[in-house]
């Protein structure tokens, strides 16, 4: 009798566990789409005479593509990555993240590695799902700064069918 009860108890708990999956799938920006977004964003900034770096990351903030234009300052490589990383991991434009953290009393989120509050990072969406992000750095403040960078990022995303 003890064996039968133990077997029934095991089956009662094992069956639901077996029905659960131990894997998951995630949708992310493809390399081809990342190249297209980066190229179109760079072209948009060039059209306005800006020399920038464009970085596209996947949904988890891992770098897919980086394009540094001739004449773009060296620091723009790191800053464009931080903008794209922030937009991908927080699922919002980096400027919006910057606005939100101004209201925080805890500065911890701002001190995380690769996070920035500067404008210029924009999520790439497929429907409502964030599948990546593009970050641009290099437009001087006198020419619109991060806000201009964000406009170039949006132009790059708009050129690609996702």
Whereabouts are the PLM-identified features?
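Sec-dependent signal peptide recognition
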Residues: 1-8
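N-terminal signal peptide c-region/cleavage motif recognized by signal peptidases
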Residues: 9, 14-16
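Flexible, solvent-exposed loop/hinge segments and secondary-structure transition points
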Residues: 20-162
């Amino acid at each position: 009798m003890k064996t039968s009860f133990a077997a029934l108890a095991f089956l009662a708990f094992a069956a639901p566990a077996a029905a659960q999956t131990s894997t998951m799938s995630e949708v992310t920006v493809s390399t081809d789409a990342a190249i297209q977004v980066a190229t179109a964003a760079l072209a948009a900034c060039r059209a306005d005479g800006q020399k920038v770096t464009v970085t596209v990351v996947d949904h988890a903030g891992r770098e897919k593509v980086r394009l540094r234009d001739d004449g773009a300052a060296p620091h723009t490589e790191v800053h464009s990555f931080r903008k794209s990383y922030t937009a991908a991991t927080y699922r919002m434009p980096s400027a919006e993240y910057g606005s939100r953290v101004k209201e925080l009393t805890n500065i911890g989120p701002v001190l995380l590695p690769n996070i920035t509050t500067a404008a210029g990072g924009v999520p790439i969406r497929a429907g409502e799902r964030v599948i990546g992000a593009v970050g641009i750095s290099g437009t001087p403040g006198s020419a619109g700064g991060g806000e201009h960078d964000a406009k170039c990022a949006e132009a790059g995303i708009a050129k690609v069918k996702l």
